[in-house]
Curated annotation (Swiss-Prot):
PSII is composed of 1 copy each of membrane proteins PsbA, PsbB, PsbC, PsbD, PsbE, PsbF, PsbH, PsbI, PsbJ, PsbK, PsbL, PsbM, PsbT, PsbX, PsbY, PsbZ, Psb30/Ycf12, peripheral proteins PsbO, CyanoQ (PsbQ), PsbU, PsbV and a large number of cofactors. It forms dimeric complexes. The keyword Transmembrane applies. This is Photosystem II reaction center protein H. Pfam families: PsbH (PF00737). InterPro entries: PSII_PsbH, PSII_PsbH_sf. It is a single-pass membrane protein. It comes from Crocosphaera subtropica (strain ATCC 51142 / BH68). Belongs to the PsbH family. It comes from the Bacteria. PANTHER family: PHOTOSYSTEM II REACTION CENTER PROTEIN H (PTHR34469:SF4). Keywords: Membrane, Photosynthesis, Photosystem II, Thylakoid, Transmembrane, Transmembrane helix. GO terms for biological process: photosynthesis; protein stabilization. The chain crosses the membrane at residues 29-49.
């Protein structure tokens, strides 16, 4: 038998929506926007690392 704890009682409302699916697209478009922004961020970091994005007054040296 499961033991009831004060922490479990506090966290129970967070788990009450488990298994329920909101009809329609829900927050999928918002997730797509954030994925796109993350992709742009990664591309900028890659271009800085490759030195293909030139930043005036900013030198990058990878040697130790």
């Amino acid at each position: 038998m499961a033991q009831r704890t004060r922490l479990g009682d506090l966290l129970r409302p967070l788990n009450s929506e488990y298994g329920k699916v909101v009809p329609g697209w829900g927050t999928t478009p918002l997730m797509g926007v954030f994925m796109g922004l993350f992709l742009v961020f990664l591309l900028i970091i890659l271009q800085i690392y490759n030195s293909s994005l030139i930043l005036n007054g900013f030198t990058v040296t990878w040697g130790g």
